[in-house]
Amino acid sequence: MPRVKGGPVTRRRRKKVLKLAKGYFGAKHALYRVANQQVMKSLMYAYRDRRQRKRDFRKLWIVRINAAARQNGLSYSRLMHGLKLAGVEVNRKIVADLAVNDQAAFAQLADLAKANLNK
């Protein structure tokens, strides 16, 4: 049985990897072996950080809500508990946006939370 070298397949695979490595520094964008390692590592980082991004944004929203809540005389946990008791179903992203862009509306939410905590 004759030997099959697989030239076109190999070339396509290498071309695909080098295309993904476009913009990398040094040998990482030019040499297949190094580029392949870096592309695999980059894809792992991308997969991990797509999940990390969700956690990072949640943390950021909580920090912003906490800062605004303390200006209104509440802690973050008491504000969120008060809103839950009031039956207000707005997520942290929206509450954080109100805290940054519309302090008056956030103050109304804080007052609502305070009122429901004292019941």
From Swiss-Prot:
It comes from the Bacteria. One of its GO terms (molecular function) is rRNA binding. SUPFAM superfamilies: Ribosomal protein L20. GO terms for cellular component: ribonucleoprotein complex; ribosome. CDD domains: Ribosomal_L20 (cd07026). Keywords: Ribonucleoprotein, Ribosomal protein, RNA-binding, rRNA-binding. GO terms for biological process: ribosomal large subunit assembly; translation. It holds the Pfam family Ribosomal_L20. InterPro entries: Ribosomal_bL20 (IPR005813), RIBOSOMAL_L20_CS (IPR049946), Ribosomal_protein_bL20_C (IPR035566). Binds directly to 23S ribosomal RNA and is necessary for the in vitro assembly process of the 50S ribosomal subunit. It is not involved in the protein synthesizing functions of that subunit. Belongs to the bacterial ribosomal protein bL20 family. NCBIfam families: rplT_bact. This is Large ribosomal subunit protein bL20.
